[in-house]
């Protein structure tokens, strides 16, 4: 859970694992029951996500999760002896080739050599732009470019039918040279870990927030619904970024003013805060820490009639 639930919601509940970091939200850790564990952002083992189906051996391979590094920025894996070298080489080779051919990475590399910084915008896969929203963001980016000309924009806009997203296609848009629009990002980690990335603008989604947090990237949130407003509050409370005053509206003045502050006026302050919280994410334990908690709890409790769904006599 990103939004830490109340203990005792289920008769089987003995603990809660929160993907948040202690003190990240507006409540002190002591406000929570002692059965709540803050482990920070969690990610799937990176090696399992890299290769295409064609690059995986046809025979089944059992991977050892205990020996894997679950860090979002470190890639190591070990497998049983029979497939160890072969599978790891396949995965690393596929990942290296994919990065070499990734046009987004090539563009970001070039931006870095030209001393440019990048703002990454991703409002989520289920977000549909109205024409007004789209034009307002363009207007905000135009103002930003005049104020902070060294910032380029990588804007991810999902493809949707025009009857639900009535905006120009990439070909129709005729965007200025400082904006690169993509309908899909091949590898989000490549973007978030790239040294040219200066900030991430998003809708307050759990993935967008956690991924940027784990990579130490300053954030700007234009929250859109339900829990995204809470995440906007987390971002401002922790000092890692800013939250649009007019959310969920895309007000050009509001957006451009916040982005100028985030990317220029107070950039070092936000950057240092984001890097500090990145270290706290590592310290919280992440996926490996969550695994340890789950395994220890499983070893500590007896299942009634060997049924894990049975109520625990000593549940919260």
Predicted regions: what they are:
Residues 184-235:
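A donor-sugar binding/catalytic signature common to diverse glycosyltransferases
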Residues 152-158:
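Short internal beta-strands
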Residues 155, 220-222, 242-244:
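Short hydrophobic alpha-helical runs that function as membrane-insertion/retention elements
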Residues 237, 241-242, 247-248, 252, ...:
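Conserved donor-nucleotide binding/catalytic region of nucleotide-linked donor-dependent transferases
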């Amino acid at each position: 859970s990103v939004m830490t639930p109340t203990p005792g919601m289920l008769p089987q509940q003995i603990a809660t694992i929160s993907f948040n970091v202690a003190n990240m939200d507006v409540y002190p850790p002591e406000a929570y029951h002692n059965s709540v564990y803050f482990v920070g952002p969690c990610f799937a083992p990176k090696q399992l996500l890299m290769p295409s189906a064609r690059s995986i051996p046809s025979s089944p391979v059992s991977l050892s999760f205990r020996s894997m590094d679950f860090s979002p920025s470190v890639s190591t894996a070990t497998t049983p002896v029979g497939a160890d070298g072969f599978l790891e080489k396949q995965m690393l080779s596929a990942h290296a080739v994919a990065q070499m051919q990734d046009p987004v990475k090539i563009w970001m590399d070039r931006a870095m050599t030209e001393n440019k910084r990048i703002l990454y915008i991703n409002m989520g896969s289920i977000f549909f732009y109205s024409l007004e929203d789209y034009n307002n963001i363009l207007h905000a980016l135009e103002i930003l470019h005049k104020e902070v000309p060294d910032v380029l924009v990588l804007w991810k806009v999902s493809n949707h039918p025009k009857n639900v997203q009535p905006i120009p296609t990439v070909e129709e848009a005729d965007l200025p040279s400082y904006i690169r629009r993509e309908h899909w990002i091949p590898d989000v980690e490549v973007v978030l870990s790239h040294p040219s990335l200066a900030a991430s603008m998003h809708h307050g989604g759990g993935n967008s927030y956690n991924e940027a947090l784990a990579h130490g990237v300053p954030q700007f949130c234009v929250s859109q619904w339900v829990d995204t407003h809470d995440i906007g509050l987390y971002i401002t409370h922790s000092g890692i970024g800013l939250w649009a005053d007019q959310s969920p509206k895309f007000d050009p003045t509001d957006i451009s003013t916040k982005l100028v502050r985030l990317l220029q006026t107070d950039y070092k302050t936000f950057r240092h805060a984001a890097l500090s919280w990145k270290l706290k994410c590592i310290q919280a334990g992440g996926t490996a820490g969550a695994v340890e908690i789950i395994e220890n709890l499983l070893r500590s409790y007896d299942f009634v009639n060997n049924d894990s769904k049975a109520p625990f006599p000593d549940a919260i």
